[in-house]
Amino acid sequence: MFEKQANAQDPAFSQFYANPLYLNPAFAGATPKGCPRASLNYRDQWPGIGRTYVTTSASYDQHIDAIGGGVGILVQNDRSGNGNYNTTHASLLYSYHLEINRKFALKAGFEASFRSLSLDWNNLTFGDMIHPQYGFIYPTQENQNNPDVQNKIFPDFSTGFIGYSENFFFGFAAHHLT
């Protein structure tokens, strides 16, 4: 038996093929040779409830023959609950292209990111703030002044590979390796 600490989940894009660098770092430069690709994505989850989850991302990648693969950049922001919890990350990606034969190739990719997490305590509600009869009358006992809880900036790494031909592709990605 083993255990591993789990962290909050990443945003999920329903049209994941429209954001290939977010899906797998091996997709960096997976375009016709020399052809650049730019992508902009916007997601507003559950807009009818008021405090939505809004995610935006922008990416650029291109295959470069001189380095034997592709490079890319990905910037993403995820804002939850009217900005109470905000996650931003910026990534640089590289993928190596290996042509097995004329009909099949492999790409191995690596992503290095800096991630920023912030939490706005002023707009959060905790159970210890609510009186059963009078509503919100108490201050919270939660630790709001701890900078380790409010803001974090840290590096993060991901890796992946894809194999592809004219008719199919397959792949695997491992994110948040730190």
What is each residue range found by the language model?
Residues 2-8:
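Sec/Tat signal peptide C-region and signal peptidase I cleavage site
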Residues 9-178:
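Subset of outer-membrane beta-barrel
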